[in-house]
From Swiss-Prot:
Keywords: Aminoacyl-tRNA synthetase, ATP-binding, Cytoplasm, Ligase, Nucleotide-binding, Protein biosynthesis. The gene is leuS. ATP binds at residue 589. A motif ('KMSKS' region) lies at residues 586-590. This is Leucine--tRNA ligase. Pfam families: Anticodon_1, tRNA-synt_1, tRNA-synt_1_2, tRNA-synt_1g. The lineage of its organism: Bacteria, Pseudomonadati, Pseudomonadota, Alphaproteobacteria, Rickettsiales. It comes from the Bacteria. It comes from Wolbachia pipientis subsp. Culex pipiens (strain wPip). It is found in: Cytoplasm.
Length: 819
């Protein structure tokens, strides 16, 4: 007798219906896993991510919630455009094929998705809404256009994100990346910087690590801006510093290579230096070049040299700093390299420190009117002096910068803007949305095909009627993923205020910690921006955030150091060949330490795959792949199936209220496991859930079918219901086997009997002539005669009952048999 998982799983996948009721009065629960990019094939990371979310969704349905559990596709992006370029295929066709393949794969896992709410971000019906958002952002002052520095790939002729620049070269072309100034569109995320920072504290169910990462990314710092007069130029240099108290220790100023002042410097040596410096990273050796310019110290009669330095970033503050080498590590290294003065102005106990920078608290000295003050007081005093002189002020600075959303790519959402020579920047009228991508594009040359399109690019100006040109940049793909969770709330992929307010925020959001900053921060910003524009009233998109760990596997190499797939390694080992067994690492295509989920599902079934990725390891921790572990899960499923089927009949209308003795103990254990397992599900301790229902399975198997059939029936009914969120196909099949009514996923969650959870048992010592011979567990305050009988029976193999002279019993503590 064998469990036919293939037919069972296919049958129930076709039978389930998880649509959401529009008119339900139930309390809502919104469960969402981060939607995937349609690469065409799911991997084990996907499987683990989606299995975690599905357990929560199924459990919440069983607890009586109206569950929204949708799925969609983050469909725009570079891979589709690159595939089009490399294979001469339309990105839309390539993307749709991949979506179709992945949809089939996801359905084979048995995920309880609301498939009727499926969306794809590359559909005009989806992105027409974000084009309208953009127009509203313009109206509310949340979007603007300006010239800014970008990473430019001269071969692909496009802007690259910082993450796409590897060792100063384009990740795809290998060309040396240039810095260019281009007009770009931005969203004013900085308008919400303080609110984004402050409200992190309200996210009680977010991992602290994620909140810390966002806090650092926003990077609030308090200090001062100071205007330095540049000798020989009718200009001032504005800097921001968090350490204005160290101003008397300043020995130089430095600007970044992209600072506006640098653009006026024509010296060949300086231009060559800047060109070489741009390819180097911030963590390289601290280098710089003297500009030939000096600035006036605000309080001292001395000049400070102005340098261009590679550790000064335009992205922070004003792109300029004053250097105090005695109290900053970077400044110290720079000063040593270029022989600049090192002037200490803070010390612990009036002791000068010259050999290394001092970063601690202390007393000011060498600082005129600041001498003798502690640092905090010195900051206040010097800021007041700067304000009195009109050359500085107290300033709060954020590391966070406005979000540049322009991409010189075809496969993205068109930005709904028209450029007219007479009227300037003109928004596309709302009635003309969506601006749809043309399909007749060519990818034969580098750059953005939209920029060279013979017809799509040209359009009449909505204001004056003259010929104008469309904006050919497209939105950053993070734009689409920053609001998709709101689109799922409505059936037509739009933003409906009532349904958004009903279902949002997302109650459980599941995804990798690699999205801790950009995606999650942009989504938080979008909710604030859309709230400001009147779309809904939800500021925070995600109540509980679960960042699942990675799926890891041992790595293998052959004798020549070539990476091997696990199955290749097994074949070589079987042939006696030598291979190198490496460390356990995250599954990756490059190192070939991957396992195809489709192979596991085909060989063992979806429930085995689901059970394995949920067993042993807490969701937030990395898990190690184990073939033996998969086999063990498969054996458990078959064992449970046989155990239920071999009972032949199970009475789902059991009554065990009056059972006593050992059977009562079994029933208590079952209900305690149910209670603990339910608490584990509430707190997403899914590995503990698995451990408890495995224990429950073994417990039920111990019960004597002759004396405890009714209790077995109760245990089986509970067990089948509690495994359903994790192994839904098996559970549905067993529910039908025992004569269950309707579909199991629609049945309520079993409730543990509170009276059985009270631990009213005590351990009593059994003595013979005062010496301990056994211990027994009995109910608290058991009548003495019953206690004596149980105690006597427990040592019946040690005494001749006919020789018992008397029995002394102390309730709840000890029984002494005197012979």
């Amino acid at each position: 007798m064998k469990y036919d998982f293939k037919n069972v799983e296919k049958f129930y996948q076709n039978k389930w219906d998880f649509s959401v009721s529009k008119d339900s009065k139930k309390k809502k629960c919104y469960v969402l896993e981060m939607f995937p990019y349609p690469s065409g094939k799911i991997h084990m990371g996907h499987l683990r991510n989606y299995a975690i979310g599905d357990v929560i969704a199924r459990y919440k349905r069983a607890r009586g919630f109206e569950v929204l559990h949708p799925i969609g596709w983050d469909a725009f992006g570079l891979p589709a455009e690159n595939a089009a370029r490399d294979n001469n295929i339309n990105p839309a066709a390539w993307t749709q094929d991949n979506i179709d393949n992945m949809r089939t794969q996801l359905k084979s896992i048995g995920l309880s998705y609301n498939w009727d709410r499926e969306l794809s971000t590359c559909e005009p019906d989806y992105y027409k809404h974000e084009q309208k958002f953009f127009l509203d952002f313009l109206k509310h002052g949340l979007a603007y256009r300006k010239e800014s520095w970008v990473n430019w790939d001269p071969v692909d002729q496009t802007v690259l994100a910082n993450e796409q620049v590897v060792d100063g070269k384009g990740w795809r072309s290998g060309a040396v990346v240039e810095k260019r100034k281009l007009f770009q569109w931005f969203l004013k995320i900085t308008d919400f910087a303080e609110d984004l920072l402050h409200c992190l504290q309200s996210l009680k169910n977010w991992p602290e690590k994620v909140k810390t990462m966002q806090e650092r990314w926003i990077g609030k710092s308090e200090g001062a801006t100071i205007d330095f007069e540049i000798f020989g130029l009718n200009k001032k240099l504005k800097i921001f510093t968090t350490s204005p108290h160290t101003l008397f220790g300043a020995s130089f100023l430095a600007v970044g290579a992209e600072h506006p002042i640098v653009q006026d410097l024509k010296d060949k040596e300086i231009r060559d230096f800047i060109g070489n410096m741009k390819a180097k990273g911030e963590n390289d050796e601290k280098i710089g070049i003297y500009t030939g310019l000096n600035v006036k110290h605000p309080f001292l009669d001395k000049e400070l040299p102005l340098y261009i330095a590679n550790f000064v970033l335009m992205e922070y503050g004003e792109g300029a700093i004053f250097g105090c080498p005695a109290h900053d590590q970077r400044d110290f290294e720079f000063a040593q390299k270029y022989g600049l003065p090192i002037i200490p102005v803070v010390c612990e106990e009036s002791t000068e420190i010259l050999k290394e920078p001092y970063f601690g608290d202390g007393v000011m000295f060498n600082s005129e009117f600041l001498n003798g003050l502690m640092i905090n007081e010195a900051k206040k005093v010097i800021i007041k002096k700067l304000e009195e002189k009109g050359i500085g002020k107290k300033t709060i600075n954020y590391r966070l910068h406005d979000w540049g959303i322009s991409r010189q790519r075809y496969w993205g959402c068109p930005i709904p803007i028209i450029h007219c020579k007479d009227c300037g920047i003109v928004p596309v009228p709302e009635k003309d949305l969506p601006v749809v991508l043309p399909t007749d594009v060519e990818f034969t040359s580098g750059g953005n095909p939209l920029d060279k399109h013979p017809t799509w690019k040209f359009v009449d100006c909505p204001k004056c009627g003259k010929q104008a040109e469309r904006e050919t940049d497209t939105f950053d793909t993070f734009f689409e993923s920053s609001w998709y969770f709101a689109a799922f709330c409505s059936e037509n992929k739009s933003i409906n205020k009532d349904t958004c307010n009903r279902f949002m925020p997302v109650d459980y959001y599941i995804g990798g910690i690699e999205h801790a900053i950009l995606h999650l921060l942009y989504s938080r910003f979008f909710c604030r921006a859309l709230t400001k524009c009147g779309y809904f009233d939800v500021k925070e998109p995600f109540s509980t955030l679960i960042t699942q760990g990675m799926v890891c596997h041992i790595t293998y190499k052959d004798e020549n150091g070539k990476w091997l797939f696990p199955e290749e390694a097994k074949e070589l080992i079987a042939k006696g060949a030598k291979i190198q067994v490496g460390k356990v690492e995250k599954m990756s295509k490059s190192k070939k330490n991957t396992v195809d989920p489709n192979f596991i599902i085909e060989k063992y079934g979806a429930d085995t795959a689901r059970l394995f990725v949920l067993s042993d390891t807490p969701p937030e921790k990395d898990m190690e792949w184990s073939d033996d572990g998969v086999e063990g899960c498969f054996r458990y499923i078959n064992k449970l199936w046989r155990m239920v089927v071999q009972l032949r009949t199970v009475n789902i209308h059991y009554d065990n209220e009056n059972i006593v003795g050992k059977l009562l103990e079994y029933r208590k254990k079952i209900h305690k496991l149910l209670h603990g397992l339910t608490d584990d599900l509430e707190n997403c301790r899914l590995n503990c859930v698995v451990a408890k229902f495995r224990e429950m399975t073994n417990l039920i198997a111990e019960i004597d079918v002759k004396t405890g059939k009714s209790l077995i029936d109760e245990g089986i009914c509970i067990l089948i219901r509690v495994i359903e969120p994790l192994m839904p196909h098996l559970a549905e099949n067993l529910w039908q086997e025992i004569g269950g009514e309707g579909m199991l996923y629609m049945q309520p969650w079993p409730k543990a009997d509170e009276s059985l959870l009270i631990d009213n048992m005590v351990t009593v010592a059994v003595q013979i002539n005062g010496k301990l011979r056994a211990t027994i567990k009995v109910e608290t305050d058991l009548p003495q005669e019953e206690l004596k009988k149980i105690a006597t029976d427990s040592v019946s193999n040690k005494i001749d009952q006919s020789k018992i002279r008397t029995i002394y019993a102390v309730p709840n503590k000890v029984v002494n048999i005197v012979i």
